[in-house]
């Protein structure tokens, strides 16, 4: 039932728009949160007053003459947000504000990107965007027409596989399939539960490469199964070429292959014969190219020359060997011990493969990876679900499947939804984090544990019971355990190219396991209002922190301590029209650094996101007979005062924040909701006289200029008073440091005052700051200084006593 007042086409556009905006926010930095309705920007005030939210995303497109405002329905700690419409664009020269649709927004992105990246292909990405929207509309129509539910409490393997209607939530063209026409789309898409027979070729055995770690060649099995079904002409042909092998193929790919020059030559030379469609009907899993039948012992993962999202889905020859290698390994004592040590993880392996060569060259279109099918007979109804589908948003305003499962479990157990959510997530971390880190360390096995490769088996209560990993492409071995696995299976990586160097392991593994997988679950729970994401992030941090001393690979250190993580840029990859399956490219996708969400474990709400506007700390200095107090900045009451302060002559050279009220208001409305910094007003004997701005180097630009820790905090300090006997600068700065150091999450306080700010340098030296070096920042040359609690208290022992009294 559709509870939204949107057509399927409009809903498809909104889903794609949400994905596109989220991709932009992940891959570009010219955006900020924007809080409230401005007083000095009339054009924006008049328009955002009409939107349903007080928080917007502002994108600074000033280099192309505009800015954009997007209403935020839910802002996520993990980086995938929910938005309302409309999106507004303001022409800066005229202040004209108008709505911008998804195509207009993509055009702006492409225009802006040309100033940063090379080879931007706007026309192609716009076509793919339109294709994605049209395809999603088709899938939504099918959902409605067939009254198909995708949020049932229990779903079979194939039902769950075919429930991922909305697609990749962090891809700008999530349902793009270039190569399928409308008939193909309905017939071969998992979203429409398409059914089709496979196409079969008869091929000279000298041109077939085949392996099966489980025993008999699959072509032999298929021959015995398909031969009785052949028509008389094809039986006669096979009887003539009795040693030829039967090779299955996805019917769409078969049509593609039959018009390729090499294949046509093979036909002319009698090396290959096209038999056509035979046998049982298969249906696609979520990947489109892997097909399933409940009556088949195998699932077939075909090459498919259809560009799905960013790549033509081609099996490369070395990848075929990875499935075969891991299947062999799991049969050894190495594999038996691994499965005994970590029963929480099960591997759906591809023990067999078929490839076809011609003139000593493998034809990639024929590459088939063949997977064991554990979902046959009674097991076909197992409550096993693709993680990406489980994390999918609700459709048409209905609850998501994850929400239904947790709410139902809470009802059955008579517990709060939040408690069940936390318990559910703890159980997921239990079967995920320690086993995966342990397998990597002890056995050297690394897997691309992203949401599309992971399935979760749920127990009768709805809690995670087991993880299934699939995809032969995603098996690797770290360099540090190469000797171990090579001793077990000599020559294991010769064909599969599956050894990964230790240096690149942590960044890539973090992207698959944490960014995509674990934090994807956090995001789904948060977006469904089931739990506070901060609580879930804390659980993730603790789960990895517990393993810090057990991990020798550097993975855990990277996950919990790095300021930024290595992340895939699907939008930039799409804008540059890169085919990720291009084997000629060393790095076929674009990767970039993004902030580490686990740093939020050390985030100080009291410094950066205070909830009060009242006095938070006061101190009386008896010797000077002065009382100094501080409170968080209130933009409605303090703005005009601080604007006047920043326009005083002594402030201009160092602060450089003088200018129109509209510009300063924009700055405040973007920093106040940010994770970077906040502003406090200081009083001397009840007279507002100074400001200080605590900031967090994990999000502030300064953190990129030194080896920042998540417990580091800094502050900017400004005294508005110029009369010497009224300034009390030293005492005021003490109050700021007293407050900062009373918070247990703070480790040390850093400074980066300009080398020209001599008075500031004198004060902070007296307060216990030590100079660590000089840093060259875009807007200044600065001294990097550190101040610890002990260093501060040593210089100002009365502050230690003050802290004890608090």
Can you describe what each PLM-predicted range is?
Residues 1-431, 459-606:
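Nucleotide/phosphate-binding site architecture used for ATP/NTP-dependent chemistry
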Residues 300, 626-628, 687-691:
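Glycine-rich phosphate/pyrophosphate-binding loop shared by adenosine-nucleotide-utilizing enzymes
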Residues 304-308, 453-460, 471-474, 634, ...:
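Short, flexible loop/turn elements at secondary-structure junctions
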Residues 424-460, 467-468, 682:
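Conserved catalytic-core segments centered on acid/base and nucleophilic motifs
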Residues 650-667:
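Conserved GNAT-fold acetyl-CoA-binding loop/helix
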Residues 669-681, 690:
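A short helix-loop-beta-strand connector motif used in the catalytic cores of GNAT acetyltransferases and
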């Amino acid at each position: 039932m559709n509870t939204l007042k949107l057509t399927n086409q409009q809903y498809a556009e909104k889903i794609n728009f949400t994905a596109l905006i989220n991709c932009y926010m992940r891959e570009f930095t010219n955006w900020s949160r924007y809080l409230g309705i401005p007083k000095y920007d009339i054009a924006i005030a008049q328009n955002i007053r009409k939107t349903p939210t007080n928080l917007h995303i502002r994108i600074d497109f000033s280099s192309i003459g505009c800015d954009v405002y997007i209403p935020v329905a839910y802002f996520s700690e993990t980086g995938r947000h929910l938005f309302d419409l409309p999106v507004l664009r303001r022409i800066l020269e005229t202040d004209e504000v108008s709505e911008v649709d998804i195509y207009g927004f993509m055009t702006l992105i492409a225009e802006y990107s040309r100033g940063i990246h090379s080879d931007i292909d706007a026309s192609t990405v716009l076509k793919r965007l339109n294709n994605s929207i049209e395809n999603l509309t088709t899938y939504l129509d099918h959902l409605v027409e067939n009254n198909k539910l995708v949020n049932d409490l229990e779903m079979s393997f194939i039902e769950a596989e075919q429930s991922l209607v909305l697609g990749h939530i962090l891809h700008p063209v999530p349902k793009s399939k270039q190569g399928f026409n409308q008939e193909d789309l309905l017939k071969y898409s998992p979203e429409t539960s398409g059914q089709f027979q496979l196409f079969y070729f008869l091929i000279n055995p000298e041109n077939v490469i085949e392996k099966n770690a489980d025993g008999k060649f699959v072509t032999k099995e298929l021959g015995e199964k398909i031969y009785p079904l052949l028509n008389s002409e094809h039986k006669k042909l096979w009887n003539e070429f009795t040693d030829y092998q039967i090779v299955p193929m996805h019917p769409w790919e078969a049509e593609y292959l039959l018009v390729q020059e090499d294949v046509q030559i093979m036909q002319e030379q009698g090396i290959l014969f096209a038999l056509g469609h035979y046998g049982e009907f298969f249906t696609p899993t979520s990947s489109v190219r892997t097909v399933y039948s409940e009556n088949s012992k195998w699932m077939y993962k075909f090459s498919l020359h259809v560009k799905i999202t960013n790549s033509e889905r081609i099996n490369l020859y070395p990848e075929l060997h990875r499935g075969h290698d891991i299947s062999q390994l799991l049969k050894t004592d190495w594999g038996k011990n691994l499965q005994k040590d970590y029963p929480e993880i099960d591997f759906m392996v591809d023990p067999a493969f078929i490839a076809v060569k011609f003139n000593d060259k493998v034809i990639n279109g024929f590459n088939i990876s063949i997977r064991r099918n554990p979902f046959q007979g009674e097991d076909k109804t197992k409550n096993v679900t693709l993680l990406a589908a489980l994390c999918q948003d609700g459709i048409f305003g209905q609850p998501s499947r994850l929400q239904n499962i947790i709410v139902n479990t809470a009802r059955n157990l008579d517990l709060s939804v939040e408690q069940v959510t936390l318990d559910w997530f703890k159980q997921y971390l239990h079967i995920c984090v320690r086993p995966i880190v342990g397998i990597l360390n002890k056995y050297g096995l690394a897997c691309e544990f992203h949401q599309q490769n992971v399935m979760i088996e749920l127990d009768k209560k709805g809690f995670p019971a087991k993880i299934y990993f699939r995809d032969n492409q995603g098996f690797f071995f770290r360099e540090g355990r190469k000797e171990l696995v090579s001793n077990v299976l000599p020559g294991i990586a010769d064909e599969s190219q599956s050894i990964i160097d230790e240096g690149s392991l942590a960044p890539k593994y973090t992207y698959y396991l944490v960014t995509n997988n674990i934090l994807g679950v956090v995001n789904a729970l948060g977006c469904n209002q089931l739990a506070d994401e901060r609580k879930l992030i804390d659980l993730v941090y603790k789960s990895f922190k517990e393993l810090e001393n057990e991990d020798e690979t550097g993975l855990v250190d990277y996950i919990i301590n790095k300021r930024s993580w290595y992340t895939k840029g699907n939008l930039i990859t799409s804008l540059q029209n890169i085919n990720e399956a291009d084997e000629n490219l060393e790095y076929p996708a674009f990767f970039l650094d993004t902030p580490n969400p686990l740093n939020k474990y050390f985030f100080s709400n009291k410094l950066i996101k205070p909830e009060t506007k009242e006095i938070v700390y006061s101190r009386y200095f008896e010797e000077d007979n002065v009382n100094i107090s501080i409170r968080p900045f209130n933009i409605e009451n303090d703005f005009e005062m601080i604007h006047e302060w920043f326009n005083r002559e002594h402030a201009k050279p160092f602060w450089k924040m003088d200018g129109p009220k509209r510009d300063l208001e924009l700055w405040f409305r973007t920093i106040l909701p940010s994770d970077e910094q906040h502003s406090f007003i200081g009083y001397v004997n009840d007279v507002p006289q100074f400001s200080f701005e605590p900031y967090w180097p994990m999000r502030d630009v300064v953190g990129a200029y030194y080896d920042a820790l998540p417990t580091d905090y800094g502050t900017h300090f400004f005294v508005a008073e110029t009369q010497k006997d009224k300034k009390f600068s030293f005492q005021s700065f003490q109050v700021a440091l007293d407050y900062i150091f009373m918070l247990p999450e703070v480790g040390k306080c850093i400074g980066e005052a300009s080398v020209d700010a001599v008075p500031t340098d004198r004060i902070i030296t007296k307060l216990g700051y030590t100079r660590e070096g000089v840093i060259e920042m875009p807007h200044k040359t600065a001294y990097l200084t550190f101040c610890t609690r002990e260093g501060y208290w040593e210089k100002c022992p009365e502050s230690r006593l003050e802290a004890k009294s608090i």
